[in-house]
Design a protein with these regions (language model features):
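Short flanking/linker segments adjacent to small metal-binding domains or redox-active Cys/His motifs
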Residues: 78-126
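Short recognition patches in nucleic-acid-associated and regulatory proteins
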Residues: 25-40
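Short, charged surface segments at domain edges that flank catalytic/cofactor-binding sites
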Residues: 1-15, 38-49, 90
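Short Cys/His-centered divalent metal-binding micro-motifs
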Residues: 24, 45-74
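Short cysteine-rich loop/turn motifs with clustered Cys
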Residues: 2-29, 53-58
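Short edge-strand/loop segments of extracellular domains
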Residues: 36, 73-81
């Protein structure tokens, strides 16, 4: 991913989708990757719908900790080889909203999808 592509990703996501950070630790995170069976989908591996912004700390946790990996799959931050990133919602935890991500760096917020599941009171457990 080059700087221009990462800038488009940052313009779409605006912050780490887990913690809301907006500092220089932000990196691109593949939702489906080689470790989750994404190698057979090389043509779509770097599509914008398969990329989200995470801070380096959250990225390390979901790549190395089983509990965090489960959480990442629950929120659509990580996907199995069978999931289509362009149709699988991803959760923006700081804004408490699910979104569909397009391959053109678009983002459609799903205002009624999962509504009420997370509130300010219980989101800290995630």
């Amino acid at each position: 991913m080059n700087r221009r592509e990462f800038d488009k990703l940052l313009a779409r996501d605006k912050h780490c989708l887990h913690c809301g950070r907006v500092d220089d630790t932000l990196i691109p995170q593949h939702r489906a990757n080689r470790g989750f069976g994404g190698a057979g989908r090389k043509s779509t591996l770097n599509n914008a719908s398969n990329l989200i912004v995470f801070c380096a700390e959250a990225n390390e946790l979901i790549e190395s900790d089983a509990g965090w990996a489960d959480r990442a799959r629950f929120f659509g931050w990580k996907l199995s080889r069978w999931a289509d990133p362009s149709t699988t919602p991803v959760y923006d935890l700081p804004n408490m909203i699910y979104c569909i991500l397009g391959d053109d760096y678009s983002r459609v917020e799903l205002h009624n999808f999962g509504k009420g599941y997370l509130t300010n009171e219980n989101r800290e457990s995630f």
